[in-house]
Regions:
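Bacterial N-terminal signal peptides that target proteins for export
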Residues: 1-8
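C-terminal motif of bacterial Sec signal peptides marking the signal peptidase cleavage site
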Residues: 15-18
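An exposed, glycine/acidic-rich loop-and-rim segment of catalytic or binding clefts
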Residues: 23-80, 86-411
Length: 411
């Protein structure tokens, strides 16, 4: 599986300190999702004639409430295979071929629901209703103060992280697998009630995963509230191109199409500034190994995050709904390569600074500090409290809609 994007997108565009934009791909139009199937037998969506792609459904586990969790295996015609579940829309496994055609699982996660219900750092999850942090769990809309549960205290400063302790990553979503030619995927839907985790308004949400024959994993987010409410959806998949639980990601080379960032305070809350990355360890406008500068002494931003855990502002963000390149990731040893394209204005780069050996992965091996990284497309953290940031307040009846693609290949 050779890289089909590199020369066009990263080879030329990034060397010129910029990123290209591309038209948003057309996604299949899935049917409305039914209730979660209460079955345990394997089911297979009818494959298209002569297609190498397929979707298989099977029982995964029951959660602590006794609810059934189903697994959907998306086998792409281009060689990528994904196992996803309807508990939080989590990606449990992601098999990526290397430069020799050998596939490995390259994402962090657990073999059972119990792992996700106890020590899970959002592995592979849909994040909502608000991805990233909201300072002190407070925000104001039209003079009304809304109080959210605080579930994170970096630097001893409380915040609401990723939608609260019972965010959308903990929901059993309705799920409908589909196949449209060589495109395979799952449509996840859920209803978040008014007052869910303290947020105002009922929200009808739909997240569509599509795996294409070009080895593109497309995520389309849609949400419609009935009251003004902040919405900021993302995916929290962790990557390690060495393979799951196989060392750290410090030798991975990262490029970010971002010449600015939003610096944070000791609580990892943005200060409201947007500052250039030039001349700092945060300058990834050209490729750098993640371990090259992550422990730079005297850099307050790295000290606050115990490494990289920051929002980067895209240099050339999406216009008119077109996808813009946000990042590229490369592992020279395996040859695995990925690009991230999005309609969002920012991307959170997190290099696994809070992973510990208390988290035991799918191979029975403990995860290492910095044993995985996340590239989360998003609006900026704490936007409801930062008037200078692009707004995340969605109006009643307004359709919130964003798209992100993870494009996999080798070189």
């Amino acid at each position: 599986m050779k890289n089909i994007y590199g020369a066009l997108c990263c080879g030329l565009a990034l060397l010129a300190y910029g990123c290209a934009t591309a038209p948003e791909s057309e996604a299949p139009a899935p049917a409305e999702a039914p209730e979660t199937p209460a079955v345990q037998e394997v089911q297979e969506v009818q494959a298209a004639p002569e297609s190498k792609a397929s979707v298989t459904t099977k029982f995964f586990a029951k959660n602590k409430l006794g609810q059934i969790v189903m697994q959907y295996t998306l086998k792409g015609a281009g060689g990528v295979v994904m196992d996803v579940i309807n508990y939080g829309g989590k990606v449990v496994r992601l098999y990526l071929p290397d430069k020799n055609g050998e596939s490995k699982d390259c994402t962090l996660g657990f073999n059972d629901v119990a792992g996700y219900e106890t020590v899970d750092p959002y592995f592979g999850s849909i994040i909502g209703r608000y991805g990233n942090r909201i300072a002190n769990g407070l925000f104001v809309i039209d003079g009304v103060t809304y109080r959210l549960p605080t579930n994170n205290e970096p630097g001893g400063i409380p915040c609401c992280l990723h939608g609260g302790a019972a965010g959308w990553d903990t929901k059993i979503w309705n799920a409908e697998p589909f196949q449209n030619g060589d495109n395979v995927g799952v449509v996840f839907t859920t209803t978040s009630p008014d007052g869910d985790q303290g947020f105002p308004g009922k929200v009808e949400a739909k997240v569509t995963y599509t795996l294409t024959p070009e080895n593109v994993w497309r995520i389309e987010y849609e949400a419609v509230p009935d009251k003004k409410t902040p919405i900021n959806l993302t995916q929290h998949i962790y990557f390690n191109f060495n393979g799951e639980a196989e060392g750290t990601i410090l030798d991975h080379e990262l490029t970010l199409c971002a010449d600015k960032m939003t610096p944070v305070d000791a609580g990892l809350i943005p200060t409201g500034e947007i500052t250039p990355v030039a001349g700092t360890p945060f300058d990834f406008t050209t490729p750098h190994k993640i371990g090259e500068r992550v422990d730079t002494k005297g850099d307050k931003q790295l000290e606050y995050g115990n490494g990289y855990d920051h929002n980067f502002v895209l240099t050339n963000p999406s216009k008119n709904g077109e996808l813009a390149q946000a990042a590229a990731l490369y592992d020279a040893k395996s040859g695995r390569y990925m690009e991230v394209w999005t309609t969002e204005p920012g991307i959170q780069f997190y290099c696994g600074n809070f992973l510990t050996d208390k988290m035991v992965g799918k191979q029975g091996k403990p995860y290492q500090f910095r044993g995985g990284l996340a590239l989360e497309t998003q609006h900026y953290p704490d936007s409801p409290n930062q008037p200078s940031f692009p707004t995340t307040i969605v109006q009643p009846g307004q359709v919130y809609k964003t798209t992100t693609e993870y494009r996999f290949g080798t070189k």
